[in-house]
From Swiss-Prot:
Record organism: Pasteurella multocida (strain Pm70)
First-listed, main subcellular location of the protein, grouped into a coarse class: cytoplasm
Name by which UniProt lists this protein: Trigger factor
Substrates-to-products reaction catalysed: [protein]-peptidylproline (omega=180) = [protein]-peptidylproline (omega=0)
Similarity section: Belongs to the FKBP-type PPIase family. Tig subfamily.
GO biological process, one term: chaperone-mediated protein folding
GO cellular component: cytoplasm
GO molecular function ontology, one term from the record: protein folding chaperone
Domain PPIase FKBP-type intervals: 161-246
Statement: the UniProt record of this protein carries the keyword tRNA processing: no
Leader sequence segment: none
């Protein structure tokens, strides 16, 4: 076998391979012998069919099968010999395939880029430093109390935190529009479910009152015929209810699990949950900055085939989220996923190089700790730990996450890291 490799463009390569005729014909003869042992031909016993009849009957299909095997085996021999970092599948083109002549074919393929990390010391990372305060815990307890709240009817005027029951009729230019009318409609005030100005127009009114509200539909409103239109809503306020929060007692906290018997137990449990959530959020925030820095300092080309594979993964995930199937996923435009797919391939290559260049191995103790932290969120943590330990796929996922975290740590060790005090809300609700 002889071959030549050339670069066509970017990460694309083409190899031309010549396989001696004797090699091909020998493979054909061996396959014909194998076929002859089991071939059934009228007039002959199994295994006793003459070679020339086997050749005539099965020769074409055998040569086709042998061709596929020879293309694959000789191409991958070149890949192994030349230590090619192959990306995706090759495209074969046969240039010569005739009996008694050398087989000549080409394979066009892509390779992964050679990555030489640079600029790690130029990456800037801002690391939030957060202390969970008693006030933070109080806020979480308020959320729990609101989830268990009841509602009591009141004769007082409606406020922005109340629940109201209304009839309304909406009109534009004096005409009632489709979907603009409802009776006994329950509205939780302050949640922004209605168009701007609607809830504000109810505040200050009491049950039994009838009044009008003048509003303007937003330009981005979903109904084309209402975008930007001035509207009038005739309101009948039938009921106003105020939220009644349960008292913070041992009886109340007992609803939240067998380990919460007192208010102090609940506060401790909430603190542990908040610490776990905070740790995950801080890890994600720092990792995001590290990855952004790696990409900014290391511009690399990526194989189109790898991007296409990632697009298909993202398509499938999108379809699953919305209850679709493979056929529906295939209809989603690739443009929706192309940038994200390219970024994911780039990040994967850069982190792989960090792992290789720093000779990182999975920290098994760290993996064990991660599983225990996941399990601590369940009522039977020991069972969760055992379930993970017996599930090879889950364990591999955990090890991959840990190795990726170790890679991020390796970059952080060289990056410019500054610490900045932040609140729990700053980290958990950055858009708030």
């Amino acid at each position: 076998m002889s071959f030549t490799i050339e670069t066509t463009q970017g990460l694309e390569r083409r190899v031309q391979i010549t396989v001696p005729a004797d090699t091909v014909e020998g493979a054909v003869r061996e396959e014909l012998k194998r076929v002859a042992k089991t071939a059934r031909v009228d007039g002959f016993r199994k295994g006793k069919v003459p070679p020339h009849i086997i050749e005539k009957r099965f020769g074409a299909s055998v040569r086709h099968d042998v061709l596929g095997d020879v293309l694959q085996s000789h191409f991958f021999n070149v890949v192994m010999e030349q230590k090619v970092n192959l990306a995706g599948r090759p495209a074969f083109a046969v240039e010569q395939f005739e009996a008694g002549k050398d087989l000549v074919f080409t394979a066009t393929f892509e390779v992964y880029p050679e990555v030489a990390l640079q600029g790690l010391d130029q990456i800037k990372v801002e690391k939030p430093v957060v202390e969970i305060s008693e006030a933070d815990i109080d806020k979480m307890i308020d959320v729990l109390r609101k989830q268990q709240a009841t509602w009591a009817e009141t004769a007082e005027a409606a406020s922005a935190e109340d629940r109201v029951v209304i009839d309304f009729v909406g009109s534009v230019d004096g005409e009632v529009f489709e979907g603009g009318k409802a009776e006994d409609f329950t509205l939780f005030m302050g949640q922004g479910r209605m168009i701007p100005g609607f809830e504000e127009g109810i505040v200050g009114h009491k049950a039994g009152e009838q009044f009008d509200i003048d509003v303007t539909f937003p330009e981005e409103y979903h109904a084309e015929n209402l975008k930007g239109k001035a509207a009038k809503f005739a309101i009948t306020l039938k009921k106003v209810e105020v939220m009644v929060l349960p008292e913070l007692t041992d009886e109340f906290v007992a609803k939240f699990g067998p380990n919460t018997k007192t208010v102090d137990d609940l506060r401790n449990e909430i603190r542990k949950n908040m610490q776990r959530e905070l740790k995950n959020a801080l890890t994600a925030k720092v990792k995001g900055q590290v990855i952004d820095g790696l990409l900014a300092q290391n511009a690399i080309d990526v194989p189109a085939s790898a991007v296409e594979q990632e697009i298909e993964v993202l398509r499938g995930q999108a379809a699953q989220r919305f209850g679709g199937n493979k056929e529906q996923a295939a209809q989603l435009p690739r443009e929706l996923f192309e940038e994200q797919a390219k970024r994911r391939v780039q990040v994967g290559l850069l982190l792989a190089e960090v792992i290789a260049s720093h000779e990182l191995k999975v920290d098994e103790a760290r993996a064990k700790t991660m599983i225990e932290e996941i399990a601590s969120a369940y009522e039977q943590p020991a069972e969760v730990v055992e379930y993970y330990s017996k599930n090879k796929e889950l364990m591999n996922n955990i090890r991959n996450v840990v190795l990726e975290e170790q890679a991020v740590d390796a970059v952080l060790a060289k990056a410019q890291v500054t610490e900045k005090a932040a609140s729990f809300d700053d980290v958990m609700n950055p858009q708030a």
